[in-house]
């Protein structure tokens, strides 16, 4: 593994136009589902997309993309990302620790230094090539992995992070901690997505609120960050993920037919129109927080 010079962006990220982290305050809010759908939407829009899974103890993206039997190969320029799709306009590739574990049942019992070393290797040793977007799927909460990725990406100037929550108050309370973490490490919050906001009936396609709603919107107003949208639970999306290996269509083609695709297309349009200079401000409380040196 090559050592990255202090103050110099990682050479492996030099060809990447936009770097976006996907964050959540707690587990179980569908963060990896949001990462997957963001990647599929951007690819279907014609962009070259890479996805980096740094949820080291729970890597789920190989399963989400139907790549559980794939492996990472070492090429002359570094680790080669696993290809999900390459079409005439866009492309999609993935890197995950899940490709190195072999068996899905293998557990990862690592202390902080080993996790940090693995993340450094993911940042410096992957041959991404030219990408429009690199999406980084992070673990829930604020852990060693978050601190490591923030430090490793500091000089590569990531665009910021998308924070995923669910409508319930227990989830939105944890999101406040995630927002404060982003402020401390100088990571811009690009917006909040309220996931699992309603349930799409598989028979009539009517969307019904099964939880409370509006928690994500209220958070965005409190912290003056963009509200990107709300995403319902659609059983047909789960069915699509489960059956993708046996389908004659590619995952991107199947997703284009999903009821969730238009929702994420609107979210991506909002994201791409953003002014990157918008600060994060808590209207209820405005503590003076110094960024770490």
Curated annotation (Swiss-Prot):
Signal peptide: none
Residues the entry annotates as binding ATP: 25-32
Keyword match Metal-binding: yes
Effect of residue 182 to A: Does not impair function
GO BP, sorted A to Z: iron-sulfur cluster assembly; tRNA wobble uridine modification
Entry-annotated residues carrying Phosphoserine: 291
Keywords from the UniProt entry: 4Fe-4S, ATP-binding, Cytoplasm, Iron, Iron-sulfur, Metal-binding, Nucleotide-binding, Phosphoprotein
GO cellular component: cytoplasm; cytosol; cytosolic [4Fe-4S] assembly scaffold complex; iron-sulfur cluster assembly complex
Entry note: cofactor: Binds 4 [4Fe-4S] clusters per heterotetramer. Contains two stable clusters in the N-termini of NBP35 and two labile, bridging clusters between subunits of the NBP35-CFD1 heterotetramer.
Outcome of substituting residue 207 to A: Does not impair function
Keyword Nucleotide-binding in record: yes
InterPro entries tied to this protein: Mrp-like_CS (IPR000808), Mrp/NBP35_ATP-bd (IPR019591), NUBP2/Cfd1_eukaryotes (IPR028600), P-loop_NTPase (IPR027417), YlxH/NBP35 (IPR033756)
Subcellular location per the Swiss-Prot or TrEMBL entry: Cytoplasm
Record-listed [4Fe-4S] cluster binding positions: 201, 204
GO molecular function (one): ATP-dependent FeS chaperone activity
UniProt similarity note: Belongs to the Mrp/NBP35 ATP-binding proteins family. NUBP2/CFD1 subfamily.
Functional note: Component of the cytosolic iron-sulfur (Fe/S) protein assembly (CIA) machinery. Required for maturation of extramitochondrial Fe-S proteins. The NBP35-CFD1 heterotetramer forms a Fe-S scaffold complex, mediating the de novo assembly of an Fe-S cluster and its transfer to target apoproteins. Nucleotide binding/hydrolysis seems to be critcal for loading of Fe-S clusters onto CFD1 and NBP35. Required for biogenesis and export of both ribosomal subunits, which may reflect a role in assembly of the Fe/S clusters in RLI1, a protein which performs rRNA processing and ribosome export.
Protein name per Swiss-Prot or TrEMBL: Cytosolic Fe-S cluster assembly factor CFD1
Record organism: Saccharomyces cerevisiae (strain ATCC 204508 / S288c)
Native organism taxonomy: Eukaryota, Fungi, Dikarya, Ascomycota, Saccharomycotina
């Amino acid at each position: 593994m090559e050592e990255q010079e202090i103050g110099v962006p990682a050479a492996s990220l030099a060809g990447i136009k936009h770097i976006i982290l996907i964050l959540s305050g707690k587990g179980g809010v569908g963060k990896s589902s949001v990462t997957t759908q963001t990647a599929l939407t951007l690819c279907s829009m014609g962009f070259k997309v890479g996805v980096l899974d740094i949820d080291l103890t729970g890597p789920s993206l190989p399963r989400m993309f139907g790549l559980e039997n794939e492996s990472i190969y070492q090429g002359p320029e570094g680790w080669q990302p696993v290809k999900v799709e390459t079409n005439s306009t866009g492309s999609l590739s993935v890197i995950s620790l899940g490709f190195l574990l072999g068996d899905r049942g293998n557990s990862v019992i690592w202390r902080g230094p080993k996790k940090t070393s693995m993340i450094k290797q993911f940042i410096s040793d992957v041959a991404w090539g030219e990408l429009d977007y690199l999406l980084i799927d992070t673990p829930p909460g604020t852990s060693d992995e978050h601190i490591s990725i923030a430090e490793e990406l500091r000089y590569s100037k990531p665009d910021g992070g998308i924070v995923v929550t669910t409508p319930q108050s227990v989830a939105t309370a944890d999101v406040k901690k995630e927002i404060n973490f982003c402020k401390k490490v100088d990571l811009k919050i690009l917006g909040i997505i309220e996931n699992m906001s309603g349930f799409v009936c598989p028979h009539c396609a009517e969307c019904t609120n099964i939880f409370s709603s509006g928690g994500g919107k209220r958070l965005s107003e409190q912290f003056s960050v963009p509200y990107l949208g709300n995403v319902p639970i659609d059983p047909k999306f789960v069915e699509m993920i489960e059956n993708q290996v046996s389908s004659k269509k590619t995952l991107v083609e199947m997703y284009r037919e999903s009821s969730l695709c238009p929702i994420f297309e609107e979210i991506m349009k909002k994201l791409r129109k953003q002014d990157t200079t918008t600060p994060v401000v808590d209207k209820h409380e405005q503590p003076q927080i110094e960024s770490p040196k």
